Amino acid sequence: MLAAAAAAGCGGGSGEGRKIVQGTGYTFSTPGSWEVVRTARQIQAVEGKHSLALVAVSRFPLLRTFRPELWNKVMKELDRAADQIAHQQEGSVTESATETIAGQKARRYKIAYDLRGKKVVETLAFVLRGKTEYLLLCRYEQSKSADACDLLLSSFRLI
C-alpha cells in the first residue's frame, strides 16, 4: 500500500525570503535561494552544490482509498517502512509522532545516520489523502539549522 521511500531530505539553510513551490495537488515553501528540481513524481529543493541539506515532496498512488478509520493499521505499516529506511541507511529512527499536516492526520519520523562522513537527520512525513500518499522528506546536518525542514512541514498544503 505504501510506496518505498527514496533517499532525500531537509536542510538548514538561510536564504533570504521564501519561495512557494506548486506541485500536482499541493504547495509548499522553501528558502528563496534554494534551487528547485522537478521530476514526474517529486519536487526537490536543494540548498547548494556542497550542502547535504534538501527538502522534497513526492506523490505515490495508493492501491486503495485511504479512510481515516484505517489509521491504526496504516500507522503500523508506516512504522515498519520508517524502520526499513533507517536500516537501509545504517541509521536509527530517533523520533516518531502522529501529527496534523495540511489538515490531515500524518505520521512523522526522524532518522539519524552518517552521510559522506557527516551526521545528518532526515525527517519523513507521510500524508495520506484519498488514493494518494504524499511523502515529505527533508535532510540537514545535525550541527546545522532545521529551519528549512520546519518550513516544509508547516507550509505544506493540499489544494
Can you name each region flagged by the protein language model?
Residues 37-134, 140-143:
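Conserved polar/disulfide-associated segments of primarily extracytoplasmic proteins
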